[in-house]
From Swiss-Prot:
One of its GO terms (cellular component) is cytosol. It is found in: Cytoplasm. The lineage of its organism: Bacteria, Bacillati, Bacillota, Bacilli, Lactobacillales. The keyword RNA-binding applies. Keywords: Cytoplasm, Initiation factor, Protein biosynthesis, RNA-binding, rRNA-binding. This is Translation initiation factor IF-1. Belongs to the IF-1 family. GO terms for molecular function: ribosome binding; rRNA binding; translation initiation factor activity. The keyword Mitochondrion does not apply. One of the essential components for the initiation of protein synthesis. Stabilizes the binding of IF-2 and IF-3 on the 30S subunit to which N-formylmethionyl-tRNA(fMet) subsequently binds. Helps modulate mRNA selection, yielding the 30S pre-initiation complex (PIC). Upon addition of the 50S ribosomal subunit IF-1, IF-2 and IF-3 are released leaving the mature 70S translation initiation complex. InterPro entries: NA-bd_OB-fold, RNA-binding_domain_S1_IF1, S1_domain, TIF_IF1.
Length: 72
């Protein structure tokens, strides 16, 4: 899959869900379901409610995404 057609947007984690899923509220007010990317999982980076994150979304399904960065 080509990575040139992804949408990157910032948001805030609202709720943790089972299986490393998170409810993220985006800057534009929408809520999506997001999972953690492999690099974040590999480096044991903890994500808690209230954290500001960057989310990658596919233009084909705008209700799901992947957390790629947690701001310090």
């Amino acid at each position: 899959m080509a990575k040139d057609n992804v949408i990157e947007i910032e948001g805030t984690v609202k709720e943790t869900m089972p299986n490393a899923m998170f409810k993220v509220e985006l800057e534009n007010g929408h809520e999506i379901l997001a999972h953690v990317s492999g690099k974040i999982r590999m480096h044991y980076i903890k994500i808690l409610p209230g954290d500001k994150v960057t989310v990658e979304m596919s233009p084909y399904d705008l209700s799901k995404g992947r957390i790629t960065y947690r701001f310090k």
